[in-house]
Curated annotation (Swiss-Prot):
Any single Gene Ontology cellular-component annotation: ribosome
Chain's gene name: rpmJ
UniProt cross-references to Pfam families, sorted A to Z: Ribosomal_L36
SUPFAM superfamilies tied to this protein: Ribosomal protein L36
Key words of the record: Ribonucleoprotein, Ribosomal protein
Family listed: Belongs to the bacterial ribosomal protein bL36 family.
Coiled coil: none
InterPro entries assigned: Ribosomal_bL36 (IPR000473), Ribosomal_bL36_sp (IPR035977), Ribosomal_LSU_bL36 (IPR052010)
Name used for this protein in its record: Large ribosomal subunit protein bL36
An example Gene Ontology biological process: translation
Signal peptide: none
């Protein structure tokens, strides 16, 4: 999982989710796209 200051979709199957005030990107097709903000 990458932690970066700005997160966004990197492909069509990425989903943006908010959990406990943090923004996550999860991707089933390409798990390398997992990101977290903050």
């Amino acid at each position: 999982m990458k932690v970066s200051s700005s997160v966004g979709k990197r492909c069509e199957s990425c989903k943006i989710i908010r959990r406990k005030g943090k923004i996550y990107v999860i991707c089933k097709k390409n798990p390398n796209h997992k990101q977290r903000q903050g």
